[in-house]
Amino acid sequence: MKVLVLGAGVAGVSSAWYLAEAGHEVTVIDRAKGVAMETSFANAGQLSYGYTTPWAAPGIPTKALKWLFKSHPPLLFRPDGSLYQIEWLWRMLQNCTAAHYQTNKERMVRISEYSREMFRRFEAQTGMNFEERKKGTLQIFRQTKEVEAAEQDIAVLERYGVPYRRLKPEECAEFEPALARVTAKIAGGLHLPADATGDCHLFTENLYKLCQEKGVQFHFNQTISRIDHNGLRIKAVETETGRFEADAVVCALGCFSRTVLAQLDLDLPIYPVKGYSLTLPVTNSDGAPVSTVLDESYKVAITRFDNRIRVGGMAELSGYEIKLPEKRRETLALVVNDLFPEGGDLSQALFWSGLRPMTPDSTPLIGRTRFENLFLNTGHGTLGWTMSLGSAKLTADIVSGKDTEIRSDDLSLSRYQA
């Protein structure tokens, strides 16, 4: 079967890989000049299978109001002039109940744990290098109330058999020795030993090469202008420079999935949530993180690659703009300098921003649409890297008409149309 994948980020390229593995003739198109040039370019680097948590959570509305008055808020709202922004926020608020949180968390953990297994199989098959470190995630809490609030997440971890360990402040240095210098700033910690880190952009570039070896065709600098369909069947996707016919189409366009598929009267509840990152060279390995440290207070992750530190996080609801305000840079610099003051050189840091495709319930959209040959693999929010291989394998199995290895019926767009 000829399958066309829209989007060459980590979701699209991973989908292409598994579709090619299944024997399909695969073509990928993207508006950028290469793979992983947008959301996948400089994300936080976490493969946080255990730390898979919905943004829509009990208490978030109250926290969001308090954050408005902080000098370095983890969440920032800027009106973008659209009614849709308000509608999306309202949908998200409706998911901030304890019942919805548990349902959404379970879906997310299910995908993430499956993705962990897919990474295990993939690495055994390919031996790919993407600066991966399998040394876990350390979530640190600066306040006692944050430690107490984490018990809700721990209950879900136990339900899914995800290994974890509660830590006293001084125990955090067992996993991140450099934190011994700042123990007084920590109220407690949670260690997830099965998590990992890795460079998403490097991974996608290497996977792109493997896909090419399997015969996958890539066409870059292709901006989609029209989707040609006959009733509920997609015939072709037209760009400014070509026409791509296919038996099946997979949409993995991240935040732009909504705008592109709007012409088909498909209402994808995706909003672009802007995030930021700094990438700085390691100057003192003893003073740098070993793996990923997640600062719960600032919602910022500090991740170690081979010779670099990636500091990423925050959430800004401001539409599709990707400006780089100095205030956001200051927040990232503050957090890494506060916890790892001797680890890297901030004067050489590269500042970046990207748009995460977030759904109101934080769960991605995977599977069928009302169009018989149009499939989705999008809306992963902050967890596109973590969920990449799991989501892609689910998508490939659904496109191929195979039974999926885990439950997937509650991941499709239909959950918003009931």
From Swiss-Prot:
Pathway: Amino-acid degradation; D-alanine degradation; NH(3) and pyruvate from D-alanine: step 1/1
Family that this chain belongs to: Belongs to the DadA oxidoreductase family.
GO molecular function: D-amino-acid dehydrogenase activity
Recorded catalytic activity of this chain's protein: a D-alpha-amino acid + A + H2O = a 2-oxocarboxylate + AH2 + NH4(+)
Residues reported to bind FAD: 3-17
InterPro entries, sorted: DadA, FAD-dep_OxRdtase, FAD/NAD-bd_sf
Pfam family, one: DAO
UniProt GO BP: D-alanine catabolic process
Official protein name in the record: D-amino acid dehydrogenase
Gene: dadA
EC number: 1.4.99.-
Function: Oxidative deamination of D-amino acids.
Alphabetic keyword roster: FAD, Flavoprotein, Oxidoreductase
Gene Ontology CC: one annotated term: plasma membrane
NCBIfam families: PRK00711.1 (NF001933)
Co-factor requirement: FAD
Organism: Neisseria meningitidis serogroup C / serotype 2a (strain ATCC 700532 / DSM 15464 / FAM18)
Domain of life of the native organism: Bacteria
